[in-house]
């Protein structure tokens, strides 16, 4: 009997939105050029634009998409070239008839009028033009970044777009990494996708990290909202709302514990409260048929304003995560990244320098740890 293939939308790239009004570059009345890899093949593409966390009206005056630098196809919104989204709104484009093969690259061009204040900063190839609409212009009209900006600006702001989807009959695992800056910075998410696919596990690893994000509470007033809404609040949108999602990695809690300033904060942001939040999200994910991986919190002794009381809560939370039976698997990032002589600190080669965020080498080690937990294999090429 011939097998009938069923096409469905699969997210090949996404980002969780936060307020980016303090992030550079500024896209006011400029054009964005974003290029992302397509991990599946298909005949149609659609994009999702968002102003969920913006504080100004989003105006797109023209957009287009192409494959591997080829001819650009117009992007329409209900048949129209322009889009206006008020604060809190998001929408899909019309379906775009565009053949894409797995391994090719999709480029998205969008010209804005006025400020753009909703987006994020994750690892992706994005460029910002000089003032004007350059949707159909050659690359030479994109603003040239200075040597220093190109060298240091590894995570420039990515405005407005929140998802790229391909209509396909392929069935890869789609894993959403739900976390904070340690996820957002992409040091472990990018190598994890490569390792899983090299290991014979077709997978798309999506980054739903927001820098400074907390599980239980939204951004403190002092953070100018760039730290985003509480993960508990954004879970439906940023995990369950992702087309094709099959699994989630929860890597949250370090900022809840990191904001503990007085004894009474432990009740609302300590290990017990964070673990209860993780259990609640796990139950919701399981209801939707998702596999849930929970990550332990990496060491951070020596980081700014980190106290022995906070470290005690981190250790308690990690012990709860390791011993809990509610998660499908546990990814022990804490063990993978810890210094051999002092488990409360990141290993020297895993430390980016602030004693909190992993280096590129640290991210590689965390990715190997995640791959081992997810596949049962502890060798990168296995």
Where do the model's predicted regions map?
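Catalytic His-Asp segment of secreted/periplasmic serine-dependent ester chemistry enzymes
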Residues: 258-260, 297-382
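Surface-exposed acidic, glycine-flexible loop patches that form ligand/cofactor-binding
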Residues: 167, 237-243, 283-284, 377-382
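Surface-exposed amphipathic alpha-helices with a cationic face
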Residues: 278-289
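N-terminal secretory targeting modules
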Residues: 1-178, 184, 190, 197-201, ...
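A cross-domain feature marking catalytic cores of carbohydrate-active enzymes
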Residues: 252, 296-297
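Conserved SGNH/GDSL esterase-like catalytic core that processes O-acyl groups on lipids
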Residues: 161-164, 171-279, 303-306, 357
């Amino acid at each position: 009997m011939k097998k009938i293939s069923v096409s469905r939308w699969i997210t090949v790239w996404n980002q969780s939105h936060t307020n980016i009004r303090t992030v550079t570059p500024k896209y006011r009345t400029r054009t964005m050029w974003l290029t992302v890899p397509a991990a599946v093949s298909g005949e149609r593409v659609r994009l999702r634009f968002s102003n969920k966390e913006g504080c100004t009206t989003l105006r797109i005056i023209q957009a287009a998409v192409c494959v591997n630098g080829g001819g650009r196809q117009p992007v329409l919104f209900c048949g129209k070239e322009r889009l206006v989204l008020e604060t809190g709104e998001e929408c899909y484009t019309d379906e775009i008839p565009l053949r894409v093969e797995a391994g090719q690259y999709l480029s998205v061009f969008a010209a804005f009028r006025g400020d753009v204040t909703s987006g994020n900063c994750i690892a992706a190839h994005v460029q910002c033009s000089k003032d004007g609409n350059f949707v159909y212009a050659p690359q030479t009209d994109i603003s040239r970044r200075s040597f220093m900006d190109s060298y240091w600006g590894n995570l420039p702001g990515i405005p407005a777009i929140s998802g790229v989807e391909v209509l396909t009959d392929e069935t890869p695992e789609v894993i959403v990494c739900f976390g904070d800056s340690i996820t957002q910075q992409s040091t472990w998410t990018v190598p994890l996708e490569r390792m899983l696919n090299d290991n014979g596990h077709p997978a798309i690893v999506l980054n739903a990290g927001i820098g400074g994000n907390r599980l239980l509470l939204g951004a403190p007033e002092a953070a100018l909202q760039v730290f985003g809404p509480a993960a508990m609040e954004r879970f439906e949108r940023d995990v369950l709302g992702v087309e094709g999602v099959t699994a989630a990695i929860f890597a949250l809690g370090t900022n809840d514990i990191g904001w503990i300033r007085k004894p009474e904060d432990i009740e609302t942001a300590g290990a017990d409260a964070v673990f209860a939040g993780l259990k609640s999200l796990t139950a919701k994910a399981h209801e939707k048929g998702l596999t849930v991986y929970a990550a332990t919190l990496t060491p951070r002794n020596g980081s700014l304003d980190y106290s022995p009381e906070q470290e005690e809560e981190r250790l308690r939370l990690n012990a709860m995560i390791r011993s809990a039976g509610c998660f499908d698997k546990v990814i022990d990032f804490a063990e993978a990244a810890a210094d051999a002589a002092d488990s409360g600190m990141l290993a020297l080669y895993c430390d980016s320098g602030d004693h909190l965020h992993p280096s590129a080498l640290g991210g590689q080690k965390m990715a190997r740890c995640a791959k081992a937990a997810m596949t049962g294999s502890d060798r990168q090429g296995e």
